[in-house]
């Protein structure tokens, strides 16, 4: 990643210094495994440190993203009971469609941003970001409208019990509004990964996970909104993450972190045929692969 002054860790440090200064459990675990392999002569020590510094923020980001379902299920289970747990579980695969679409086309984003970043071509990066956002919105907004309009009919396809289907429908009806934001957030994360920065998406997505927990606690336990409250917390958290990515991309910095590697002009072209074609050609196979897992969940 692009190591910036003031980051909580730096690559220039030697292994022993890094371990003493930074007691991050994820990083230490990866580093310990890597150093064991290095001692066996299977990998180079400097590659272990570099790979660890690049990968551990991605692992934390993934955990933050995946925490959404766990938090929703746990909290509605405590507040409402088993029917709510089952309902949220049945609605989960529909939410996964957002990740199939957003994550798939984000593969095109990371490829084009990486090319532009390596060539120091800011215009190319901006075009890739804008076109990727258009593609994801064009695909996820209709999906969100479908989920919001026919939640009971959709959940009833896989849920036999009426009470469970109704709980799932209540959840899906609200969480549908977060689908476009979830897709955009995957693109936002990949923008920075393509610019060799795994730290920024980790902070943003981690903050979103914390916001999700806090919002769920208010909506479920204080306002007694049940499964709809869990869905509302998820939507709010995703909106906050999207807003954070947008502001960071427009400003090119985050207060307290300093300058970021990517800054995007929002007034450029959005419908660039060549860029959209590239994103589709790169991302479509990934969408297909992701869809296989989503279908398996159904």
Predicted regions and their residues:
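Short alpha-helical transmembrane segments in multi-pass integral membrane proteins
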Residues: 2-55, 113-178, 220-283
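Transmembrane helix-bundle signature of multi-pass secondary active exporters and lipid flippases
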Residues: 56-111, 175-182, 277-298
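Hydrophobic/aromatic residues within transmembrane alpha-helices of membrane transport systems
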Residues: 60, 64, 72-76, 88, ...
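Generic alpha-helical transmembrane segments of integral inner-membrane proteins
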Residues: 63, 67, 71, 101, ...
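Short loop-to-helix capping motifs
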Residues: 81-82, 161, 196-198, 226
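Small-residue-rich hydrophobic transmembrane alpha-helices
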Residues: 85-148, 182-201
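Hydrophobic positions within alpha-helical transmembrane segments
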Residues: 88-91, 95, 171-174, 201-204, ...
